[in-house]
Amino acid sequence: MTDSSPDASPSSLKIYFRLLGYVRPYIGLFLISIVGFLIFASTQPMLGYILKYFVDGLSNPQAVLFPGVPYLRDMQLLQAVPLLIVLIAAWQGLGSYLGNYFLAKVSLGLVHDLRVQLFNNLLTLPNRYFDKHNSGHLISRITFNVTMVTGAATDAIKVVIREGMTVIFLFGSLLWMNWRLTLVMIAILPLIAVMVRTASKKFRKQSKKIQVAMGDVTHVASETIQGYRVVRSFGGETYEQQRFLAASQGNTDKQLRMTRTGAIYTPLLQLVIYSAMAVLMFLVLYLRGDASAGEMVAYITMAGLLPKPIRQLSEVSSTIQKGVAGAESIFEQLDVEPEVDRGTVERASINGHLEVRNLSFTYPGTERQVLDDISFSIEPGKMVALVGRSGSGKSTLANLIPRFYHHDKGQILLDGTEVEDFRLLNLRRHIAQVTQHVTLFSDTVANNIAYGDLAGAPREDIEKAAADAYAMDFIAQLPEGLDTQVGENGVLLSGGQRQRLAIARALLKNAPLLILDEATSALDTESERHIQAALDKVMKGRTTLVIAHRLSTIEKADLILVMDQGRIVERGSHAQLLAQNGYYSRLHAMGLEEPAPSGIA
């Protein structure tokens, strides 16, 4: 993508015209606003002509303004000039209202549409996109960038139409009055065009940097707010203050650079315009000819009205460049292919037989193979525990089953059907996940249990799921029970309580295949007991793949797969693996999990 202006760069024009396509649903309102701005622009030359009649009327106020118009042939300048001024003001007010109000409706609708489309698009993007982009920049696109884009698509159009038509009407009137003098004004237009093009390149480049800097500010603020407990626990206040100060200062510096560019550019443009005006006034005085005083005053007045709209037209380049830079990042996200879903198979229900054959996987953009020739099978209702050091590939394997990522080689079969052949939504309806990083939403306890496809579940089913997850004991003590707000990400609940709500959510889903990533965080004895009982309940009768950290869970597994560096190095029951006195036995002696060696992610 080049940094040239929309006037010069085909790529920028393409972006801008694509952006204008979002105005199409509001074309009726948009046309009304254009009519309003045309009305407004038409009043500018009228003011010049009124001054002509006013000056001429000073010497003969009884002169008739419209001698050839019926009903008006007797109206003298004395009555006509004041009346016309009032009528022109009313006409201008009507145009201003139509233009500004209806364009505001278009602008607000455009903001809404773009934000909704961006948010909806976020929900369809593949996991790898979130791996490469931090949340601050994604949020900044929805908030800051959309505002910049709307300015380019609507506010800039307002200036271009209103001020552009004003310039055209004024130039037309000036040419009609004295075309020779008007050519002097037209002679400076090429110089103005060169200045606008040069400034546009700078504005576009600086706008991109500002949007990145604004994303950095949002990112730091978002991270600090989400992790405020860690910040306070580890005395990170000073570090975060410095980090935010640096991000905010970087944004301020870039904003100032853009302001400085405009502050230099606008006075230079004014100097060029007023220099042309000075030459024009000299020629008016020198070449007056047989023109009346009123005609000369009208001509100079209309010429004097030109610098303001010309300056605003030149300054709109800044708004357009900000919008084009913002639109570029927005369209970059909108153009990302959504999650791959080429499957056609839909099953109303499955038994839960899971088989993995010769599975290998490498994360996109990396070379290290995370999974290497993995094979195992789980019969319906059985449990397989994945055990291994951190970074051995356990979580990656679990993420491939619901197709958060797509495997390179091998097969993952669910009831004999490759998971890639399922329709994505249908596949995930058969899978429930409980991860160690519990996500709760700023809503009620009940709505967090009955989330997504589960919304609308009968109240008794929600209560049963909560009871089976051993969560009703603490829910009953909450101020409003199941209708209590849990705060952002369940901040008002303890770690054990949040985990039990996640288990209740999985129980309510009642999926035949459960993927469980046990929490490694230390909990009090009572919470540990409740969670273990809840896990026993949720795993009962379901095919379960568990990333196990608790010895009690591992001992209950029908099959234990011991993983190291992406491979299954041992398999068997707890007793069998201990008897082998191998890798599992060593992990067991060290507490079942040891740190990953250097270089293992």
From Swiss-Prot:
Listed GO MF terms: ABC-type oligopeptide transporter activity; ATP binding; ATP hydrolysis activity; ATPase-coupled lipid transmembrane transporter activity
Coiled-coil region: none
Residue span, ABC transporter domain: 354-590
SMART domains, A to Z: AAA
The protein's Enzyme Commission number: 7.5.2.6
One annotated Gene Ontology cellular component of this protein: plasma membrane
Key words of the record: ATP-binding, Cell inner membrane, Cell membrane, Lipid transport, Membrane, Nucleotide-binding, Translocase, Transmembrane, Transmembrane helix, Transport
Transport found in the keyword field: yes
Residue stretches making up the ABC transmembrane type-1 domain: 31-322
Binding site for ATP: 388-395
Membrane topology: Multi-pass membrane protein
Source domain of life: Bacteria
Transmembrane portions of the chain: 27-47, 83-103, 174-194, 267-287
Localisation per UniProt entry: Cell inner membrane
Enzyme class: translocase
Entry remark concerning the domains of this protein: In MsbA the ATP-binding domain (NBD) and the transmembrane domain (TMD) are fused.
Assembly and interaction partners: Homodimer.
Similarity annotation: Belongs to the ABC transporter superfamily. Lipid exporter (TC 3.A.1.106) family.
Role played: Involved in lipopolysaccharide (LPS) biosynthesis. Translocates lipid A-core from the inner to the outer leaflet of the inner membrane. Transmembrane domains (TMD) form a pore in the inner membrane and the ATP-binding domain (NBD) is responsible for energy generation.
Protein name in UniProt: ATP-dependent lipid A-core flippase
Source organism of this protein record: Pseudomonas fluorescens (strain ATCC BAA-477 / NRRL B-23932 / Pf-5)
